[in-house]
């Protein structure tokens, strides 16, 4: 007889985890889920095992709104090793080509400029994108190369930090879907020497405050502290969470009176004053402005429900 599935607690919000190097995003997600004893958890855009930095982990009802973080801008600090190209475009792969580093400062400036603004990027074979239902890296590990279409990306800012010997350090502010490994691989080809990533840190996601990031070790220390004090770990862990609607913070807010919100929460579009002309909105209710879900302005100017909060902490 199978054992009954253990149910976690209903905790809702977004933890800004500082992912350690060497761990997969899913591994650290599961650790956070266990530490919080959460019934649901999901991350918002995987980081490579080599990478560190901000990994927003959505708990409970916040998982419904994680898509908006997948669509948000990101900022990275990256160090590339010049003169070597690898099959994965990072230090975890095998070196497939070595060339001397001979470019000038002017050539570097020109190469960097070519990546700024709106461009097209062909994703790496070592990525989680899917082709015919299978992830690209699964094909790559079998030595199979499959066709990949170039996708539009935007590099809002590409800052030169330093060039010392065979290392080049940059800071990148980019749109969703941008692969930093691919930028470095393409840059190495433009410079004629090849390059791969040896250090990558995600500095920021959307507008989340960097000083709210916490490590797994800090979470474990809080659990131990709670046990020492004889209190629930939730008393120390839950204050670390950002609001469940924070993934959608870029969208305007529409507040509904309680007389209207009951219809909205039952799946019906409602009319209200001072709504945007179109697009998605965050919907709150009452004088407390309690978040109740995402809506979209329909053709009649009503707020139609799109994603609703089912459970909400008291």
Curated annotation (Swiss-Prot):
Keywords: Isomerase, tRNA processing. It comes from the Bacteria. GO terms for biological process: mRNA pseudouridine synthesis; tRNA pseudouridine synthesis. CDD domains: PseudoU_synth_EcTruB, PUA_TruB_bacterial. It catalyses: uridine(55) in tRNA = pseudouridine(55) in tRNA. GO terms for molecular function: RNA binding; tRNA pseudouridine(55) synthase activity. The keyword Calcium does not apply. InterPro entries: PsdUridine_synth_cat_dom_sf, PsdUridine_synth_N, PUA-like_sf, PUA_sf, tRNA_psdUridine_synth_TruB, tRNA_sdUridine_synth_fam1_C, TruB_C. The active site is at residue 48. Substrate binds at residues 43, 76, 179, 200. Its EC number is 5.4.99.25. Responsible for synthesis of pseudouridine from uracil-55 in the psi GC loop of transfer RNAs. Belongs to the pseudouridine synthase TruB family. Type 1 subfamily. This is tRNA pseudouridine synthase B. It comes from Enterobacter sp. (strain 638).
């Amino acid at each position: 007889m199978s054992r009954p599935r253990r149910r976690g607690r209903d905790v809702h919000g977004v933890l800004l985890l500082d992912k350690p190097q060497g761990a997969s995003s899913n591994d650290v997600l599961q650790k956070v889920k266990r530490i919080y004893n959460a019934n649901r958890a999901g991350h918002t855009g995987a980081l490579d095992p080599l990478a560190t930095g901000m990994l927003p982990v959505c708990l409970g009802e916040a998982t419904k709104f994680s898509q908006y973080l997948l669509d948000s801008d990101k900022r990275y600090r990256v160090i590339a090793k010049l003169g070597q190209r690898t099959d994965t475009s990072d230090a975890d792969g095998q070196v497939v080509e070595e060339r001397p580093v001979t470019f000038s400062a002017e050539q570097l400036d020109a190469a960097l400029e070519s990546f700024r603004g709106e461009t097209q990027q062909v994703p790496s074979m070592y990525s989680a994108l899917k082709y015919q239902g299978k992830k690209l890296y699964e094909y790559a590990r079998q030595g199979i190369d499959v066709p990949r279409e170039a996708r539009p990306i935007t590099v809002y800012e590409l800052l030169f930090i330093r060039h010392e010997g065979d290392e080049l350090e940059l800071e990148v502010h980019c749109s969703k879907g941008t692969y930093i490994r691919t930028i470095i691989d393409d840059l190495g080809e433009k410079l004629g020497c090849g390059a791969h990533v040896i250090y990558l840190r995600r500095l920021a996601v959307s507008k989340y405050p960097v000083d709210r990031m916490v490590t797994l070790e800090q979470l474990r220390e809080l659990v131990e502290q709670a046990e020492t004090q004889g209190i629930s770990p939730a008393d120390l862990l839950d204050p670390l969470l950002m609001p469940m609607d924070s993934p959608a913070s870029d969208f305007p807010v529409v507040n509904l009176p309680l007389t209207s919100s009951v219809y909205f929460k039952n799946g019906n579009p409602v009319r209200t004053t001072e709504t945007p002309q179109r697009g998605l909105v965050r919907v709150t209710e009452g004088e407390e402005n309690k978040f109740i879900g995402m809506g979209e302005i329909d053709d009649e100017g009503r707020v139609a429900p799109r994603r609703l909060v089912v459970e909400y902490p008291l």
